[in-house]
Curated annotation (Swiss-Prot):
Lineage summary: Bacteria, Bacillati, Bacillota, Clostridia, Thermoanaerobacterales
Alphabetized InterPro entries for the sequence: UPF0145_dom_sf, UPF0145_YbjQ-like
Domain of life: Bacteria
Name this polypeptide is given: UPF0145 protein CHY_0465
Organism: Carboxydothermus hydrogenoformans (strain ATCC BAA-161 / DSM 6008 / Z-2901)
Family, per entry: Belongs to the UPF0145 family.
Gene3D superfamilies: Hypothetical protein apc22750. Chain B
């Protein structure tokens, strides 16, 4: 399954547009991770714990979106958009949206 943020894939033509597909994940953070992130905020630097959680959530939503596209008969998803939101004080929501398509190599 090819995934792209652009609406076009070089060397391929879209032969079928199969619809909008999404993937969603809401991840809870935990007390220890919040504490470590607070320390990073105070002393400066990056929060590895939150970065790892963001990466995990992003992988979940892209895989979920790909599976939904496959069920529609797609072999690619184009125009992908990722959105990150905080929900409450300790939840992270990640949403991926794209267009499921069937592509073929250009001749």
């Amino acid at each position: 399954m090819l995934l792209a943020t652009s609406g076009r894939l070089d060397g391929f033509k879209v032969t079928k547009y199969l619809g909008i597909v999404t993937g969603e994940a809401i991840m809870g953070t935990n007390f220890i991770r919040d504490l470590l992130a607070s320390i990073s905020d105070i002393i400066g630097g990056r929060s590895g714990a939150y970065e790892q959680q963001l990466e995990e959530a992003r992988n979940i939503v892209l895989n979920e979106m790909s599976e939904r596209a496959k069920r529609l008969g797609a072999n690619a998803v184009i125009g992908i958009s990722l959105d990150y939101e905080s929900v409450g004080q300790s939840m992270l929501m990640v949403v991926a949206t794209g267009t499921a398509v069937y592509i073929e190599p250009e001749m």
